[in-house]
Structure formats: C-alpha cells, structure tokens
Amino acid sequence: VAVVLGVGLACLRQAVFQALESAGPRVGVGLRVLVKPNLLTARPLACAAPEVTAAACAWLLERGARVEVADSPGFGRADAVARKIGLEAALRPLKLRVRGLDRPVPVRLPLPEAPEGRGARFMVARRALECDLILSVPRVKAHSQMLLTLAVKNCFGCVSGLRKALVHTCEGRDPDYFADCLAALWAALPPVAALADGVRAMHVTGPSRGRPFALGLIGASPSAVALDEALCAVLGLEPGRTPLGAALERRKAEGCATAGWRAEYPLLRPGDFDARGFELPRELAHTSFHPAR
C-alpha cells in the first residue's frame, strides 16, 4: 500500500504524521527501527528536509519503537552532514543523534542472472542488518546514473563508507548491473518501509547538483518498492524505465505491480499532482563514482 499526500512547507510534521498513520509500517513497542536519511552532502536539496526526518522519528517514538538514526556517506561523516543541514538540532528535542553506519560485515548478494553461487559481495553495516525495520527517508531526486533516486536506492547507504565508492567504481559503469546489485542489497536487508520528501524535489540532474522542483508531496508506505512505483506514477514514468525499477521487476520484488501488487491510495492519488516540467536526465552517465556529481 502506498500513499501520496500533498503538502506545503508550513505543515511538514502534520503531513508526515498523516501519511504514516494512513500507510506507514506497523510499529509496536520495542521494535528496533533504523531511520535511514540520505546524508549524501550538505548541499541544498541533497538530503530530505530535517523536519521530515525528525517528524518520522517522533511518530515512531510515540508508538514505542526503539529508534536509531544513521547513514554512511561515501565521503565524510554522517554526523557532520547532519549538523550542517540542521538535522542534529531537529533531533535534539527527541534525544536522538545521528550515528554512522559502520562495523561492516560481508554480505553475498545473489543476482538473478548470475551462475549459481556467484553474485556481488557488499560490506554492509551491522546496524542495518540487526534492526527489525528500516525506514528509508529520501528526497525525491533525479539521478545522473539511475535516472531517479528514491527509497530503494537510499538503501545503498547501508554499505559502509568508502566501500560505496569502490562499488561505484567497480560496478557503476553498467547501470543495469549496478541496479541488480542494489535490488539484491534491498532483498538482503530487514523489511524496508519508506517516507519520501517530495515537497521540493530535485530535477534535471542529481543526486546533488540538480535544480529545485516544487512537487508538493510527502509519500509513505510499508514497502519502499511500492512507494517508489507510486512516485514514478506521480512523475508519469513507468517504473521499468529506470534501471533500478527494471531490476526490481526482474526480481519480482514484493511491492512491484508486475509481481501482482496493487497500490491503494487512502489519501491523494498520483494523478492529483502536477509534475509537468519535472525533467529527468536526458541520458545516463555510464561512469564510475564521482563525488562532485
């Protein structure tokens, strides 16, 4: 089930609570939840708004969850990015702080078309593997390599630190193969729910140097895959047109319409939003990791 909610900048907390109450994950007392923002860089629009992440944490805490907020940027420290964008201050009243996704362990990721016993091998943060639920909190952004970066792509931050740069360098030249690796990583993690910040999206290029686009939505779902498909619908894009969407369809991932899932929209529907003018990259960059992009 996915929900998309129209929202203005002045009522983010209310919008986040409404979205999560309508179509958020089931949360019980003591559930260990890793809230995973995308702390890529402190550049404008690169991360979800601090108020969105903090509101999600407040909603989880009110339901008795044990909440941690963590990420692992490819370069630099998560807490440093959080401080610069105001997330550290936004979390302080909740007595939460941003941690790094370190202590990596090797995880072998079987790929659909690879020979049996072969596949990718990622070094994944132990904290991400040991929680009960991950709540992915991305901003809706164009991406020069993956076309879009949404909730499932945000899971790549569970690969520790500079190891992401190594993966990009080794696998990033082929977007389809890299997308298969990302889909396999999502499948290896605990259940991934999602809350997407699309109030001010990023378009034209990304994930860090695109232009702002007033999309005006917050999206939530217990399934990161289902939310990504709903956001593609908002943008008038078939999920399979993105490398990662196609990889998830090949895997018949739970949450894909092609696997038999049908989204229900208890609030607004994708057609209620006007995404005309949202520009995607004209061609994908078949290149290795470049921190300035």
Annotated model-derived regions:
Residues 1-293:
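N-terminal and secondary-structure boundary signal
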